Amino acid sequence: MEKAFYRDTWAEIDLDAIFYNVQSMKQHVGSHVEVIAVVKANAYGHGDIQVAKTALEAGATRLAVAFLDEALALRKKGISLDVPILVLGATKPQYAPLAASQNIALTVFRADWFEQAIVYAPYEQPLNVHMKLDTGMGRLGAKTKEEVQQMIYAIEQHPSFILEGVYTHFATADEQNIDYFSFQYDTFLHMLEWLSIQPPLIHCANSAAGLRYPDRIFNAVRFGISMYGLAPSQEMKSLLPYPLKEAFSLHSRLTHVKKVKGGEKISYGATYEAETDEWIGTVPIGYADGWLRRMQHFSVLVDGKRAPIVGRVCMDQMMIRLPYELPVGTKVTLIGEQQGDRISVDDVAAHVNTINYEIPCTISYRVPRIFLKNKSIIEVRNAVL
């Protein structure tokens, strides 16, 4: 992956913000609680290895990803074998020995998984597993006492397996109404009584639960969205126990500036017509970069002023109405701060009627990531080259 890029569009990742958010969570939950840094989906679009290393430096003790490939990628990129990595999604039984050899723990939730995984035993290294219990999310997890006890029996009978953890996932921890959260929490407590083995790790808290209920998270918290400085929901913004620092910003530069007359039209479909003489700037970012067509009419920052996107967003470019003539090369901020004004990830999410999680995840590999510490560039990643 190249350290240079040749296009006037880039994302900036503030690693100091990541560090602060992890340290703040550690202080919030207490020293007896491990912080598991969730770096799936390329660390929510921020950069997996850079965020992982920063989170570990800040005090996280483990990493979590969505599937085995992501875990193996972290190992290849330099995360040492002494750092445990948990795969949160399903993994085929035949890959269990590979995971074990790389100190990658797998999520298990079916007894028949063990029946198939045993075929590949004995393993050179035992496999750590985390048993997932479905307390009401309805996604992955065992639901009955029989299922749980069958898995426990399989683990007890085969030295290739170690029950390292048991966990569940809350569906509504980020909502003000706590009824369903309380139901899931009580269900988890009840299901834990089915275990004849006490695993070292018991975890139920995502970012929302960790922030709101530090007394109900057992001994580990899976720190995802708020590690990146984003509130788990709009409802939770007023409930945050400490301020979060947003790590992701997105920028570009004007590549063309022109004056159009009233009545002239802009972009595909000729959906925008200038009412009077206007200055129009072209910005080299489009929906192939994850800046969706639905961003039409959204305003970005240029020279500290709000400039609306006019006409349809193209695959690689878009046009904005400038407040006045500006030179080619002027910086355009799509997410982030400029001259005291700020556009947040939440602002973008609200415009396209989605959640903040989706925005940095959507910004594609075509957009280089610049990593900052102490406001200085320490690394550039360009996945195109």
From Swiss-Prot:
Q: Residue span of the signal peptide, if any?
A: none
**What does the record list as GO biological process?**
D-alanine biosynthetic process; peptidoglycan biosynthetic process
**Which parts of the sequence carry N6-(pyridoxal phosphate)lysine?**
40
Q: Which reaction does it catalyse?
A: L-alanine = D-alanine
Looking up Pfam families in the UniProt record yields: Ala_racemase_C (PF00842), Ala_racemase_N (PF01168)
Q: Where does substrate bind?
A: 139, 315
Q: What class of enzyme is it?
A: isomerase
Q: Which domain of life is it from?
A: Bacteria
Any one annotated GO CC term: cytosol
Keywords from the UniProt entry = Isomerase, Pyridoxal phosphate
Q: Tell me the CDD domains matching this sequence.
A: PLPDE_III_AR
Keyword Isomerase carried by entry: yes
Similarity remark: Belongs to the alanine racemase family.
Q: What does this protein do?
A: Catalyzes the interconversion of L-alanine and D-alanine. May also act on other amino acids.
Spell out the protein name for this chain.
Alanine racemase
What is the gene name? alr
